[in-house]
């Protein structure tokens, strides 16, 4: 089994750019950024429970890793960068912490490397369970209206929230709930040590108005890039700055 994907072919000799979206997003989330790199072959994935992969279910990150590897193999992708936002960033970090032939580098935007104590894990497990119940039960527009009131989205204005609620409400609540719990931060390993021991470039992007993830970035063994005029979803808030940042990374 493989994940649903869209492909843009580039020129021979360039590594692939493999894009992973955030929770409730889909393969189109990174398209504006990816379109700025026409020479590079690009793979845009739908994660389990999302978009064209909505009917694919996993139990944990190991299941996501298996699907991601099978998908890369199905396209004969042997030389690539992983680029992920939020949930997609966590998927990318988890995947990259196992030996991966052909992985050229890791670029994460606003992805959490993992909780560090049992109390925080239990609190997150309860929180994710409550959200999952709402995604299964309530109208999605109502759930996302509350979802985007969470502190991590504090930089959004009313119009931005309204736009995101409309966009995300196209999803399937039951499959989102399943993926939310399967990839809960409560069940994710703390990846700081394996990321520090890595043998590939690791770049971490976060919006200047994203206080939570700027603090997380300071404690990561990564090259950190602050995206100006942006909050948690930096590539949506300021795509031009993210494109410029990626261009600099990929040229180095």
From Swiss-Prot:
Keywords carried by this UniProt record: Lyase, Menaquinone biosynthesis
Keyword Lyase: yes
GO molecular function list: 2-succinyl-6-hydroxy-2,4-cyclohexadiene-1-carboxylate synthase activity
BP term (GO), one: menaquinone biosynthetic process
Disulfide bond sites: none
Pfam families from the UniProt entry: Abhydrolase_6
Pathway: Quinol/quinone metabolism; 1,4-dihydroxy-2-naphthoate biosynthesis; 1,4-dihydroxy-2-naphthoate from chorismate: step 3/7; Quinol/quinone metabolism; menaquinone biosynthesis
Keyword Lyase attached: yes
E.C. number(s) listed in UniProt: 4.2.99.20
Catalytic activity entry: 5-enolpyruvoyl-6-hydroxy-2-succinyl-cyclohex-3-ene-1-carboxylate = (1R,6R)-6-hydroxy-2-succinyl-cyclohexa-2,4-diene-1-carboxylate + pyruvate
SUPFAM superfamilies in UniProt: alpha/beta-Hydrolases
Function, in words: Catalyzes a proton abstraction reaction that results in 2,5-elimination of pyruvate from 2-succinyl-5-enolpyruvyl-6-hydroxy-3-cyclohexene-1-carboxylate (SEPHCHC) and the formation of 2-succinyl-6-hydroxy-2,4-cyclohexadiene-1-carboxylate (SHCHC).
Subunit and partners: Monomer.
Family from the record: Belongs to the AB hydrolase superfamily. MenH family.
Protein name, as recorded: 2-succinyl-6-hydroxy-2,4-cyclohexadiene-1-carboxylate synthase
